[in-house]
Amino acid sequence: MANRNDSRNNRRNKDDIEDQLVAVNRITKVVKGGRRMRFAALVVVGDKKGRVGFGTGKAQEVPEAIRKAVEDGKKKMINVPKVGTTIPHEVIGHYGSGNILLKPAEAGSGVAAGGAVRIVMDMAGISDVTSKSLGSNTPINVVRATIDGLKKLRTSEEVSKLRQPERA
């Protein structure tokens, strides 16, 4: 009887994609009649097997904003190349004034990363990585810079294919 509420608390969908809330902001618009409140949600989605994305959503209520953000995140998913449980090489992701340095780590060392970067790595299924956040520390900038860094990753096969001259 202890697992009665599991279906409500489990955020795993039919297509095996999980989501995790990063931040919720309250937005206030001042109108003639007073203040109009809305909410903006930032969500990271992933299957923990190498696919990850993020989405934002705005609505009058928090649950609706989260739902919109999850839908947006599923549309913008990317594939992340992995070597075992880590990333193939060191990379720097940029977005605005936010920069994220991602370095591969030995197996078993864990995710050495702060808040938003840790969530992105967890959703991507990367369990051994070291990161350093430089510049902006706003959650949306950090998530976008991390995703940019993950987009830049290449496997050794892709790099060797690019280096080989074409033969006619």
UniProtKB/Swiss-Prot annotation:
Keyword field: Ribonucleoprotein, Ribosomal protein, RNA-binding, rRNA-binding
GO biological process, one term: translation
Top-level taxon: Bacteria
One cellular component (GO) term of this entry: small ribosomal subunit
PROSITE patterns: RIBOSOMAL_S5, S5_DSRBD
GO molecular function, one term: rRNA binding
Record carries keyword tRNA-binding: no
S5 DRBM domain location: 17-80
Keyword Cell inner membrane: no
Subunit structure, as described in the record: Part of the 30S ribosomal subunit. Contacts proteins S4 and S8.
Description of its domains: The N-terminal domain interacts with the head of the 30S subunit; the C-terminal domain interacts with the body and contacts protein S4. The interaction surface between S4 and S5 is involved in control of translational fidelity.
Function: With S4 and S12 plays an important role in translational accuracy.
Family under the similarity heading: Belongs to the universal ribosomal protein uS5 family.
Annotated HAMAP family: Ribosomal_uS5_B (MF_01307_B)
Protein's name in the database: Small ribosomal subunit protein uS5
Name of the encoding gene: rpsE
